[in-house]
Design a protein with these regions (language model features):
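Short amphipathic alpha-helical segments
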Residues: 197, 209, 213, 226-228, ...
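Transmembrane beta-barrel domains of Gram-negative outer membranes and organellar outer membranes
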Residues: 19-148, 156-160, 165-176, 180-184, ...
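Generic alpha-helical secondary structure signal
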Residues: 15-16, 38, 208
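Outer-membrane beta-barrel proteins
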Residues: 220-223
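Small/flexible residues
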Residues: 4-5, 205, 280
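A mid-sequence, solvent-exposed acidic-amphipathic segment
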Residues: 171-217
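Bacterial Sec-dependent N-terminal signal peptides
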Residues: 1-22
């Protein structure tokens, strides 16, 4: 009798444990599988991608742009002319990051924040959505006579973007970027303060560590300058991402390359450049 009772207790406990394991497996099966690594970098080429630094990770980026290739051998096809942007991006949360940078030629300081609203899910939600907000201020040198007419707010401009990307398959990612940029001060009365554009971009992986990227921004209500078209190649080497670029814009922040591009591909106004990114884990 005792043996029967002991065996009954054993089988009951085993049955309960097996049922718990089965429920755990079913629960795990119901958990969403998020799609990651849509791009290798926080940039597609010049523009922002849906990628953010992870929580507690600081990303340091050196961006370098040379002169136009059609400047001739005397300027070594643009290599004698260069400008630099230094940028820092930090992940506050896995869904929230902030950034700060400065460009040498235009003397512009830019700050931005990126908020991930929704993530692509395997066999579920088809896209990743990120909101990007940025502010820009141009540094000026002015004399005492100009100080009375100088307004700091006139040097400010702002960008609002919705970055929507989808990883179509293991190699191909596409992104669309509706953008609005506001200028506090414009040059003429006919020029709008609010300028709208639509960005299209994508990347295709050639190998595990190398991808080719392309990006185009079409200006919807501002026809003063040219639309920017850029091509790039991303090379991942451990903790670094090395990016090579060709573009008709030398600018390295959104406001400038979207709405202030004068270069024309057909005229040979092509700028070569590169980015080097390094990440540091500050807080796990």
């Amino acid at each position: 009798m005792k043996k029967i009772i002991i065996l009954s207790i054993f089988f009951c406990s085993f049955s309960v444990k097996a049922q718990d394991n089965l429920l755990n497996l079913l629960s795990q099966d119901n958990e969403p599988i998020y799609i990651t690594y849509l791009f290798k970098s926080t940039k597609v080429v010049n523009g922002q991608s849906v990628e953010l630094p992870s929580k507690g990770v600081l990303q340091f980026t050196i961006q370098h742009r040379f002169g136009t290739l059609n400047s001739g051998f005397y300027n070594l096809y643009g290599l004698d002319n260069s400008q630099v942007r230094l940028g820092f991006d930090y992940g506050i949360k896995d869904f929230l990051a902030v950034g700060l940078g400065r460009s040498s030629t235009t003397k512009t300081i830019d700050a931005n924040s990126k908020l991930r609203i929704k993530r692509q899910i395997r066999d579920g939600f088809p896209v990743t959505i990120v909101a990007n907000f940025a502010a820009y201020v141009k540094q000026w040198q002015y004399t005492d006579n100009q100080l009375d007419n100088f307004l700091f707010t006139n040097q400010l401009s702002f960008a609002h973007q919705l970055l929507i990307a989808s990883k179509i398959n293991r190699d191909l990612t596409l992104q669309i970027s509706p953008t609005m940029i506001h200028y506090n001060l414009v040059e003429t009365l006919d020029e709008p303060n609010d300028k709208y554009s639509l960005g299209l971009g994508g990347r295709y992986k050639i190998t595990k560590r190398i991808s080719v990227n392309a990006e185009y921004f079409y200006q919807l209500n501002d026809k003063i300058n040219n639309n920017v078209l850029s091509f790039g190649c991303d090379i991942e080497t451990g903790g670094h991402v090395f990016q090579l670029h060709l573009s008709n814009s030398a600018a390295m922040f959104d406001r400038a390359f979207i709405h202030e591009t004068n270069g024309n591909w057909l005229d040979g106004d092509i700028y070569f450049g590169f980015n080097i990114s390094r990440v540091f884990t500050l807080n796990k």
